Amino acid sequence: MDKTTLSVNACNLEYVREKAIVGVQAAKTSTLIFFVIILAISALLLWFQTSDNPVFNELTRYMRIKNTVNDWKSLTDSKTKLESDRGKLLAAGKDDIFEFKCVDFGAYFIAMRLDKKTYLPQAIRRGTGDAWMVKKAAKVDPSAQQFCQYLIKHKSNNVITCGNEMLNELGYSGYFMSPHWCSDFSNME
């Protein structure tokens, strides 16, 4: 124990530096441990990068996919704006285009309309996925038509809109896929 005796007004005071020494030693030890951990992590990362580790290959692939999807966003924005302008032209003087109708796409029916706010095609959604596609058993299928009408009557509160909303919720906009009801609707009218 390191002691220092101080005399002040005939009073002897002993100052013990033992706790200060322990604190300094703890600081030195923790600093050394910190730098050893950082050095070990750096060496591990260097080893991962110099070896053909599948973790970094997967991360590289993920970054490429993420950048590609970000590029799609600008394309989808442009296409959504074009389709919205086209929808405004289609809706001029036609108020019934904003009401759900069963649209015949050949092999299936979809209950769809133009959205009043965005003027984009909108369909009744099946759960959390894409639109209800009521498959037809024959060229003329009254039961499929009837089920489509049932969807309009009872399920019209759950909808999906082509474009950015669909891209954000499902991962695709519907415009750049063929066949898809969004791109087919654009070609129908």
Swiss-Prot record:
Residues annotated as transmembrane: 29-49
Database matches in Pfam families: Pox_LP_H2 (PF03356)
Family matches, as InterPro entries: Pox_LP_H2
Cellular compartment(s): Virion membrane; Host endoplasmic reticulum membrane
GO cellular component: host cell endoplasmic reticulum membrane; membrane; viral envelope; virion membrane
Intravirion side stretches: 1-28
Keyword Disulfide bond attached: yes
Family statement: Belongs to the orthopoxvirus OPG107 family.
Job of this protein: Envelope protein part of the entry-fusion complex responsible for the virus membrane fusion with host cell membrane during virus entry. Also plays a role in cell-cell fusion (syncytium formation).
Name of the protein in question: Protein H2
Organism: Vaccinia virus (strain Copenhagen)
